[in-house]
Amino acid sequence: MKRIAIITGLLSGLLFGVATPFSKLLLNGLNSFQLAGLLYLGAALAMFPYMFKKNSNLKLLFQSGNRAKTTGIIFFGGFLAPLLLLAGLKSANAASVSIWLNMELVATAILGVLIFKDSLDKYTWLGVFLTIIAGVTTSFGEGFSGITSGLLITAACICWGIDNHLTALADGASPQTVTFIKGIVAGSVNFIIGCLIATQPIHFGSIAPAIVVGVFSYGFSIVLYVTSAQNIGATRSQILFSTAPLWGVVLSYIFYHESFQWVHVISIVLLAFAVIVTNILSHKHKHTHIEAEHIHYHQHTDEHHIHLHGGKIVSRGKWHSHFHTHEPITHEHPHDPDLHHRHNHEKLL
């Protein structure tokens, strides 16, 4: 399962990475609110066919246990964060913004430890430190405007950090459902606001391209990220997702012919090393699971998934998703802070 989670995390970074240079181009015909709205409406469009399936569990996102999480996901991740990002993108080159976006990893890690019971080992903390150094190094190449952009994008990353943890803990809802709700609500609100405050007519030729970018970079990318986060934890998934700048920087050089700066080279090397060191080990200790019910993609290959399907045993290697119950169990094995391992570690420190 961890191997699949690593692959989906890397793919989510690739898809999101291409959004930065394309978004900078689209801002020529759309304001920040309009573009943010269209990007998330594209995400909702990508997930729309899935909502007709019986296991979408849309109503579970609005039950008492998930209502506050869902509201936070929409507000911080779907509304506030993209606006701050696009504001920062206006006054800095796309390559630098792509690298700064990895401050989301730092925000996710700190919030995870302080609030969301995310246990981090020394390798993960090293990855966080390297990411901070990469972001600071990039700022040196941008001058004063880089400071303003860096602050705006850091604020966006804090919002996405909150979104990441709330999404990873949204119990009972599939990644596709979370993406659809965030996309349809945040997308509609942002786009309407953008049209109301617009100082010039909307450039209709930019609408379709913005939606297409949203389908891939905000739709499929979010689903892949959520799948990864629910299996190895938000912080570790964010480290994999932080490969996004590699693709954003490359496309920025291709589309905008931005100068190849030494600070970008150093930052990319630091980020690559951060991804490697944070995926070395999982920690191991004796822990107890209480009874739980939720939905996520899984195989029947561990002690957490031994349930039957209509009285029948499912093939161990078959991937599937449905609402299921976990029985209480106490055991010891290597694990990451996934949906099943959000226990406290105070006694171990």
Task: For every predicted segment, state its role.
Residues 1-37, 142-169:
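Glycine-/small-residue-enriched transmembrane alpha-helix faces in small-molecule transporters
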Residues 13, 36-38, 82, 96-105, ...:
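Helix-helix packing/entry segments at the starts of transmembrane helices
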Residues 15-20, 48, 52-95, 101, ...:
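Specific transmembrane alpha-helical segments of multi-pass solute transporters/efflux pumps
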Residues 19, 42-46, 100-114, 129-130, ...:
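Alpha-helical transmembrane segments of compact multi-pass small-molecule transporters, enriched
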Residues 26, 35, 39, 88, ...:
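Hydrophobic/aromatic residues within transmembrane alpha-helices
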Residues 29-80, 107, 159-163, 180-198:
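Transmembrane alpha-helices of multi-pass small-molecule transport proteins
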Residues 31-43, 87-104, 146-158, 204-218:
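Structural signature of hydrophobic alpha-helical transmembrane segments
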Residues 47, 111, 120-140, 149, ...:
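Hydrophobic transmembrane alpha-helices of multi-pass small-molecule transport proteins
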